[in-house]
Amino acid sequence: MSESSYGLTTFSPSGRLVQIEYATTAASKGTTALGVKATDGVVIAAEKKTTSPLADSLTLHKVFALDDHVGCTYSGIGPDCRVLVDAARRACQRYRLTYHEPMPISQLVRQISFLFQEFTQSGGVRPFGCSLLVAGADSRGNHLYQLDPSGTFWTWKATSIGKGSPDARTFLEKRYTNEMEIEDAVHTALLTLKEGFDGRMTAENTQVGRVVEGRFELLTVEQLKDYLDQI
């Protein structure tokens, strides 16, 4: 293989950074995660997949709180995501200590994207093999962002990442409306996950977080069971 296939900072003759493409492929092979923005909040949901039926699924996390007003989920390599989650949490803490208010979501996303991008042009490292969905609320309203290994980010009304992303996005395009409220958004997120779920969908192998009234919360197993009984 050519040097450009291995070198992180070497462009191929066609103008591609191949290692970033490999990282994007790794992110796309992870379990499905998705986000839905409502008029009064944001929902993010993800499939949890253990490597063995003997593993305790409650110790596996796919949705994380970053601060009181923001959380995220991911698809791809779990340890890579944890590095980004820790960095995002530190950024939120520093902002609170400095300005005595929650960090704006757009500013947090830019900070995370800088870290993503830094690992695409430095020697001795590799790109992060995961994509993130960030959901939060600030003085400008509710927000849903997607970040990719290249450091690129976008805002979305509804989107998905992971191996089931194409089918999930098609389902969301058919079901999403601009008037959707948070309860319907939770149902839509779970129905979308269920469409491409690998096996039986339960409260133990699914995780959901939502932003309601400016605060981010993780749904409990009991809350998830109630929602799953309704779909």
From Swiss-Prot:
PROSITE patterns: PROTEASOME_ALPHA_1, PROTEASOME_ALPHA_2. The keyword Repressor does not apply. Pfam families: Proteasome (PF00227), Proteasome_A_N (PF10584). Keywords: Cytoplasm, Nucleus, Proteasome. GO terms for cellular component: cytoplasm; nucleus; proteasome core complex, alpha-subunit complex. It comes from the Eukaryota. It is found in: Cytoplasm; Nucleus. GO terms for molecular function: endopeptidase activity. Disulfide bonds: none annotated. GO terms for biological process: ubiquitin-dependent protein catabolic process. The 26S proteasome consists of a 20S proteasome core and two 19S regulatory subunits. The 20S proteasome core is composed of 28 subunits that are arranged in four stacked rings, resulting in a barrel-shaped structure. The two end rings are each formed by seven alpha subunits, and the two central rings are each formed by seven beta subunits. The catalytic chamber with the active sites is on the inside of the barrel. PANTHER family: PROTEASOME SUBUNIT ALPHA/BETA. Belongs to the peptidase T1A family. The proteasome is a multicatalytic proteinase complex which is characterized by its ability to cleave peptides with Arg, Phe, Tyr, Leu, and Glu adjacent to the leaving group at neutral or slightly basic pH. The proteasome has an ATP-dependent proteolytic activity. This is Proteasome subunit alpha type-2.
